[in-house]
Amino acid sequence: MVIIGPRGPGSQRLLLSLLLLAAWEVGSGQLHYSVYEEAKHGTFVGRIAQDLGLELAELVPRLFRVASKRHGDLLEVNLQNGILFVNSRIDREKLCGRSAECSIHLEVIVDRPLQVFHVDVEVKDINDNPPVFREREQKVPVSESAPLDSHFPLEGASDADIGVNSLLTYALSLNEHFELKIKTKKDKSILPELVLRKLLDREQTPKLNLLLMVIDGGKPELTGSVQIQITVLDVNDNGPAFDKPSYKVVLSENVQNDTRVIQLNASDPDEGLNGEISYGIKMILPVSEKCMFSINPDTGEIRIYGELDFEENNAYEIQVNAIDKGIPSMAGHSMVLVEVLDVNDNVPEVMVTSLSLPVQEDAQVGTVIALISVSDRDSGANGQVICSLTPHVPFKLVSTYKNYYSLVLDSALDRESVSAYELVVTARDGGSPSLWATARVSVEVADVNDNAPAFAQPEYTVFVKENNPPGCHIFTVSAWDADAQKNALVSYSLVERRVGEHALSSYVSVHAESGKVYALQPLDHEELELLQFQVSARDAGVPPLGSNVTLQVFVLDENDNAPALLATPAGSAGGAVSELVPRSVGAGHVVAKVRAVDADSGYNAWLSYELQPAAVGAHIPFHVGLYTGEISTTRILDEADAPRHRLLVLVKDHGEPALTSTATVLVSLVENGQAPKTSSRASVGAVDPEAALVDINVYLIIAICAVSSLLVLTLLLYTALRCSAPPTVSRCAPGKPTLVCSSAVGSWSYSQQRRQRVCSGESPPKTDLMAFSPSLQLSREDCLNPPSEPRQPNPDWRYSASLRAGMHSSVHLEEAGILRAGPGGPDQQWPTVSSATPEPEAGEVSPPVGAGVNSNSWTFKYGPGNPKQSGPGELPDKFIIPGSPAIISIRQEPANSQIDKSDFITFGKKEETKKKKKKKKGNKTQEKKEKGNSTTDNSDQ
């Protein structure tokens, strides 16, 4: 507290002192205030918020608080005005005893950010304690033979105050025999003594009663008094005398009880009772309840009873006297100073305050976690404390002020590795042996969203049968997040995109919590073979993190499409077909051909033909090819055969269960000379067969040249486009693929516009031209860089027994068939190898497996039992079209061979049929001529 008085030299000195004090405070980084003890509640101490540079408005939000280690309730801060005031009674004597300096150390703590300020409040003494004597009356025996100027020490008064307030002034009541003299000791303390100025006469004055008054130096002055009773003794003119006027003893504070302190010795030259000495303790300063001293009255030995504590009192002053037994007795006085040496008997104390828990996982290095204070009541090296922390932790201790430390973050935290730390703070003093204490600090790491959900693998393949019920569960995705609580709460969603003309969400959906993927509508293999999409997993953190997984859903084919009959030149699709057959044709003559197509794939699209039992009679001279659908004569027709035959042909696929369709063929037998215009096989140029044959050959040559030229031009254009186009990677080309196969007898081509092809990329559709040669496995690189030498066939490949029946008939590809490539592309192998055959002389091949999935092998192999091995550049007789078990014959025939080259099935759109009508007309005319000559064409070769 600053007190302003009248101006003058004293006030100038006071002002200078205050300026020096303020400069010292700025240099030390602390605030210093002062307050008088016994101040009333609410007494102003200082504007602590203003002095610390804090705004009043931020005291409450920043949790402004004052902490004191032992005296937290004496002072308080008003958070409204930032004033430090007295909260409860301050007693300096109780707080600091007789210490010259007395202050209250405060810690001012504010958060956001965490700051600590140190404030010292000096407690100033006031004169609130009067000087007192230990006893109300002091008895002083004085021999009447005492010489003048004899000194008689008196017991002085004590004042609990300090400084000026404890400066004592003694005064003695008026008398004619004694005067008062003040004796100053080495420690600057004073001791009152009576000095004899006039000889005593016991007979005249046996007793004297004096009043000793004491006045302190405070304002206002406080006084005390004691009665001095002087007894005049008879002549015993020699009093006891100690060897030394004072003694000094040094003891360790850990001495045992009943330890001897010192052996005193006093002597009296008198004889008899006047020479017998009795020892006693007159006074012990300071007074202690723990430690007591006693003296043997006969021997003068002083012993200690109790415990010495350096931290309580580091020195004791024992005033002893020696009294003889003379009458009157005389006394000698001495003083024993006992100094206490400190030993390391106090364990350091550790106090953890202001914990900022939990600690965020992304907290910056240097963030203050807690404040730690240590103390040791010992002195010197025994009281010097060093703190240490548990090793190998991302924290460290930083000394801030004297015995104060800050626990700060030393390196980055990772909750996923360690979610909590048990720290041990060890405080060790410098004693020998050193003492130590520990304090445990539990630091919990709070999670932040720093880990994205992760899937077990980046891509999943799912197989789903078509015609599934709406809402069926097809797959479950699961992602794991290493974070905790809401940061690990994963939700799933579709990565929306377009699938053709529809949104992805119209096909599938994903449950946000479970990750279950559902098909919202029945899938159709014929429309959608592969559905590729992404599922996103996101956590609930802020900001949310996520990752994607790719799902490839392959739609497996089911036998849900019955064979469909194709239109013929003589009738519409599904209607009856009329054919005229001359009676002169021989056995094996092709009468008609039933053409059908199945929208399914694999076994489900593998068609077989048979005559219905109702249409089979004992004398019916016709049969149908099992896989070709060609109706041919079984023998030479004669007059006994009925002129009209109604044939019912059953077309059946190989699905489970099999689906069928029925075609009706009306066959009329006519004489050789008849050529009705209604016959589907009639030719306009039948009047001159030789001229018609020449015209047909010319047309055939022109058609073959045109097709070959178109093929070469297409290949050149395709190669030029591929070489000039920039290299791009496309997962899927949903365009219109074109397949061209070459053989010695010509070329056949296939072009099919897919209904819908789904892929994950956004690349534009491409039109691919795929050229295949038997016994060669093609890839994209093979098309651009053809090998110099053809590959040798694998001799381990065999035909299956189920297809041996088809080995004797060639499948002629026309516009009725569908040729598919599986979802894996032409590089995938068709698993058709079967080495377990009972007939080693014949090769085997198995039909497609898996309903069209992974059935894209274009490699043709012959077993070792087959005597024909294709050499380089040679072509095999038959090969398998992927997606269909049909066996394609490309055997080269002689130039004069009369093969019906029109019976060649291609799988594609119906528009392909129109392109080949002209070519068929020439073949039909030639066939009509051959029938007239009774020659046999076997198209099964």
UniProtKB/Swiss-Prot annotation:
Region (5 X 4 AA repeats of P-X-X-P) location: 734-885
Signal peptide start-end: 1-29
Membrane topology per record: Single-pass type I membrane protein
Cytoplasmic side: 719-941
Boundaries of every Cadherin domain copy: 30-133, 134-242, 243-350, 351-455, 456-565, 581-678
Per-repeat ranges for PXXP: 734-737, 790-793, 823-826, 863-866, 882-885
GO BP of this protein: cell adhesion; homophilic cell adhesion via plasma membrane adhesion molecules; nervous system development
Subcellular location: Cell membrane
PROSITE patterns: CADHERIN_1, CADHERIN_2
Extracellular side, ranges: 30-697
Transmembrane spans: 698-718
Keywords tagged on the record: Calcium, Cell adhesion, Cell membrane, Glycoprotein, Membrane, Repeat, Signal, Transmembrane, Transmembrane helix
Keyword Protein biosynthesis annotated: no
Disordered: region residues: 818-941
Residues that carry a glycan: N257, N265, N548
GO molecular function ontology, one term from the record: calcium ion binding
Function of the molecule: Potential calcium-dependent cell-adhesion protein. May be involved in the establishment and maintenance of specific neuronal connections in the brain.
UniProt-recorded name of the protein: Protocadherin alpha-12
